[in-house]
């Protein structure tokens, strides 16, 4: 399982939100590229970038920062989400050196777009499913739909999606542990690999994910915990690598 540091971008800075609320943000760095360097030097094997402004505006806003990080680390897998709602945007990021694009809101509102994106950019598409009480949320988590996460995930199995990033909104940024039972249930219900996100606080939460014995869980995204020092990236990755269960 990969430990994937998150770099959330708002107005060019690296921030963290609580439960997806833009008004409840903490700025951790004015230099996201240097922050990326910190996690790379700490041994991370993938980075998770989010254009928060883009998620709300429906188009990339912090694209220059994303491109700068991708150019600095051409051999590091980078995934980007937030405001990706057109093939042109995906093409821009792929050409910039980004490994994966995360389709969120558009995947819920126009599921057929995911199939189209997978055909145009095979192996590059991840679907981001953000949920509240098992129902998918959209538009920067501002809207909660009537669509159930597992039902939607199954729909994407035939499209060639590389992974699903599952985030429990109630847990995100709260550092109270991630929703392990639902994450494991999602991984068991679909053939698509699952990346857990939201609420990871310490090594105990990483162990809980591993203890779930769900082979479909391939990664865990962590944000506030690594910025506030309750989780060490290198230690957590080493723990995953040596885990025997």
UniProtKB/Swiss-Prot annotation:
GO terms assigned for molecular function: 1-(5-phosphoribosyl)-5-[(5-phosphoribosylamino)methylideneamino]imidazole-4-carboxamide isomerase activity
Stated family: Belongs to the HisA/HisF family.
Record PANTHER family: 1-(5-PHOSPHORIBOSYL)-5-[(5-PHOSPHORIBOSYLAMINO)METHYLIDENEAMINO] IMIDAZOLE-4-CARBOXAMIDE ISOMERASE
Organism encoding this protein: Pseudomonas fluorescens (strain ATCC BAA-477 / NRRL B-23932 / Pf-5)
Name recorded for this polypeptide: 1-(5-phosphoribosyl)-5-[(5-phosphoribosylamino)methylideneamino] imidazole-4-carboxamide isomerase
Active site annotation, chain numbering: 8, 130
Cellular localization per UniProt: Cytoplasm
Keyword vocabulary terms for this entry: Amino-acid biosynthesis, Cytoplasm, Histidine biosynthesis, Isomerase
InterPro entries according to UniProt: Aldolase_TIM (IPR013785), His_biosynth (IPR006062), HisA_bact_arch (IPR006063), Isoase_HisA-like (IPR044524), Isoase_HisA-like_bact (IPR023016), RibuloseP-bd_barrel (IPR011060)
Pfam families named in the record: His_biosynth
GO cellular component, one term: cytoplasm
Documented EC number(s): 5.3.1.16
Annotated catalysed reactions: 1-(5-phospho-beta-D-ribosyl)-5-[(5-phospho-beta-D-ribosylamino)methylideneamino]imidazole-4-carboxamide = 5-[(5-phospho-1-deoxy-D-ribulos-1-ylimino)methylamino]-1-(5-phospho-beta-D-ribosyl)imidazole-4-carboxamide
């Amino acid at each position: 399982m990969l430990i994937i540091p998150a770099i959330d971008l708002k107005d060019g800075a690296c921030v963290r939100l609580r439960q997806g609320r833009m008004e409840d943000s903490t700025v951790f760095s004015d230099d996201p590229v240097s922050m990326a360097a910190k996690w790379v030097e700490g041994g991370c094997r993938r980075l998770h970038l989010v254009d928060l402004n883009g998620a709300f505006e429906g188009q990339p806003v912090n694209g220059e920062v994303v491109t700068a990080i991708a150019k600095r680390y051409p051999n590091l897998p980078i995934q980007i989400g937030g405001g990706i709602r057109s093939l042109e945007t995906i093409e821009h990021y792929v050409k910039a050196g980004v490994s994966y694009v995360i389709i969120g809101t558009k995947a819920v509102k126009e599921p057929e777009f995911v199939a189209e994106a997978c055909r145009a950019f095979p192996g590059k598409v991840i679907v981001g499913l953000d949920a509240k009480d098992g129902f998918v949320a959209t538009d920067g988590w501002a809207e909660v739909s009537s669509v159930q996460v597992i039902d939607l995930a199954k729909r994407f199995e035939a499209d060639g999606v590389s992974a699903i990033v599952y985030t429990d909104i109630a847990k995100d940024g709260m550092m109270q542990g991630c929703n392990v039972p639902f994450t494991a249930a999602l991984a068991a219900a679909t053939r698509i690999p699952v990346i857990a996100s939201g609420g990871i606080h310490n090594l105990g939460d990483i162990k809980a994910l591993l203890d779930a014995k769900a082979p479909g869980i391939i990664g865990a995204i962590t944000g506030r915990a690594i910025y506030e020092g309750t989780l060490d990236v290198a230690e957590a990755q080493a723990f995953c690598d040596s885990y025997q269960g």
